[in-house]
Amino acid sequence: MIDFIDYIQLSFSDATRWNRDNSYTALTDTANALLDFSIPERLRVHLSSLSTPQFATTYTLGTVGLIDGSISYLFSTLPLQTTQSRSTLIPLRKLVPGYRQIHPPLAPESWDSDGPGHEGSDGQEDETTPWKRRRETLLHAILHLPPPTTLNGLFLRRLSPTTQLSVAVCSTQAKPLSKSTPQASILTQLSHDTGKYSAEFLFSTDNALLGFKGLYNFGPDPRDRTNAQRPQRASQSVSLLSAGGEMYYSPLSSVVGLSTGLRFTTLPAASETLHSPSSSAYPAPSPISTFPYTLTLTLTPLTGSLSTTYSLLASPNLAFSSRFGFNVYSWESEMVAGCELWRQKRKPYPYVSGEKDDLAWAKRKMGLLPPLPAPPTPAKRMDLTAGAGESVESDSVIKLRVDQSLNIRLLWEGRVKDLLVSAGVGLGPTSLSTGGAAYGWTGVGVSVLYST
């Protein structure tokens, strides 16, 4: 379960319409959410609040063996009026990362009709145009306690409909008896997203590290006006193939990093085609699969690492994922499998009379009350994606992960009254003090979140 502040940051990205999926950093997000989830450490309590639509705070306290905590503040120039902040109302799927359905990339110019460069009557750029108002800023700071304290800061600003600037700062307090200056580093990231491709330029003061990330989407260019004018059925795609890479270089330490990857994923149209009426003028394309799935392939040439993942959404409440890694230099391999199962809490059908009546079933049988509406048909159930559907809401989720060494992680996350609870256990081989090996507990933890 992500932190409350991270949830607010994601809401800020959604409100400013920044596509975080169109990035090389998010190439394997689906597999990572299903396979690399972490269990809580010890007992942690989070108290959060979105006191105003523009200001949020979080207080965290950890105990059992070691007492630590943190204080977080967040400010946004964009009022998050529609963001749910109460722990009883926040959709659980927005807090628990899982299978992520990728949508077709959109051109930023299609957000509004004016777009960048719109001029007013005096020939100057109009400050009230919609794209000007989207130059929003987010400020975030978190202080980790106890000493040595660590301060993390984030400055995020939309420079244009296609560009975003992010500056992250990390500073650690020096030891009490040390006269050295506190360790600090700054990471600057400039992101550019056109829908067809995305590019990220990075610079870190830590060893003067320079980096570049890029992602290219094969298929029609969403910036092409002719594609937008075609009928929706003809231009609708059922899959998306993306290729990208990243490169790092530090002139001080002579460190070089390089990786490349591919991602093939089905789009929502792949499962909707079966239930959409066909048109004689524009026949419906054949779906690749009735189940949404995502395939990724990543390669790190310098270290010889090769990794493939396959994630499948078998139903709106069940997802599977697997990963196989291999190193061509050391011949070492890795195999991980995981799944998640959601429990849906169905809302009761509304009473026609407007009041709860224990004898409504008898009155309805006698014809005194109109019959209840029919439940959804199987075809409509197939159209439901994760978290979609008006008659169901997520109540809890169970995640399971196991690798070839029998390291097992089991995580349960759900809603208990007004609290959001996350509890997990870890099992695996452990080393004994006598030099032998045994199989036992590797971690147990519970995390509780309450927000207003």
Swiss-Prot record:
One Gene Ontology cellular component annotation held by this UniProt entry: ERMES complex
A Pfam family that the UniProt record links to this protein: MDM10
Subcellular compartments: Mitochondrion outer membrane
Disordered: annotated segments: 105-130
Topology class, membrane: Multi-pass membrane protein
Coiled coil: none
InterPro entries noted in UniProt: Mdm10
Keywords on record: Membrane, Mitochondrion, Mitochondrion outer membrane, Transmembrane, Transmembrane beta strand
Superkingdom, natural source: Eukaryota
Any one of the GO BP annotations: mitochondrion-endoplasmic reticulum membrane tethering
Primary residence: mitochondrion
Oligomeric and partner information: Component of the ER-mitochondria encounter structure (ERMES) or MDM complex, composed of MMM1, MDM10, MDM12 and MDM34. Associates with the mitochondrial outer membrane sorting assembly machinery SAM(core) complex.
Function (record text): Component of the ERMES/MDM complex, which serves as a molecular tether to connect the endoplasmic reticulum and mitochondria. Components of this complex are involved in the control of mitochondrial shape and protein biogenesis and may function in phospholipid exchange. MDM10 is involved in the late assembly steps of the general translocase of the mitochondrial outer membrane (TOM complex). Functions in the TOM40-specific route of the assembly of outer membrane beta-barrel proteins, including the association of TOM40 with the receptor TOM22 and small TOM proteins.
Family: Belongs to the MDM10 family.
HAMAP family in alphabetical order: Mdm10
UniProt remark on domains: Lacks alpha-helical transmembrane segments, suggesting that it resides in the membrane via beta-sheet conformations similar to those predicted for other outer membrane proteins and porin.
Name recorded for this polypeptide: Mitochondrial distribution and morphology protein 10
Organism: Uncinocarpus reesii (strain UAMH 1704)
